[in-house]
A protein has these predicted regions:
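Non-transmembrane, aqueous-exposed alpha-helical and coiled segments at domain scale
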Residues: 1-137
């Protein structure tokens, strides 16, 4: 049975992922940071870890990026061999989601078209995309 996914769903999900990833830590990373802070013996180290936690709190509450360098968008895509994308091209949908996420999330645009010319794309595309085809849908 073929499963159909409209690429507009991919664009919306990528947009939200870009914004969320730059404003919040995943629960496992948050837990690891809290554990590191609790276990840190150095007063300076503990102070720095507490500052990181305060930064995360502010980022989440005020919806500002955790770090001013919001990086490149890198995706590892597993596509079931029984999936068919409709409404456009998957790669275009991913890049449009990145474009919307970095624009609407007010994230720093730092990707260049050509590393020698250094011309900024002004929307952080293209994303780095790794594809794997897997069984199922």
């Amino acid at each position: 049975m073929i499963r159909e996914i409209n690429v507009s769903e991919i664009t919306a999900a990528i947009k939200e992922m870009c914004i969320q990833a730059n404003h919040f830590l995943s629960p496992d990373m948050d837990k690891a940071l809290k554990a590191a802070t609790a276990n840190e013996e150095s007063p300076l180290g503990k102070k720095i870890l507490n500052q990181l936690q305060e930064n995360l709190k502010i980022a989440g509450e005020d919806m500002i990026p955790i770090c001013q360098d919001t990086g490149m968008a890198v995706f590892f895509i597993e596509i079931g061999q029984d999936v068919h994308f409709t409404g456009g091209v998957l790669e275009d949908a991913i890049n449009e989601g990145v474009r919307q996420g970095y624009t609407d999330g007010y994230l720093r645009k730092s990707v260049v078209k050509d590393p020698l010319i250094r011309e900024n794309t002004k929307d952080n595309t293209p994303a780095v995309i790794h594809y794997s085809i897997v069984s199922g849908d």
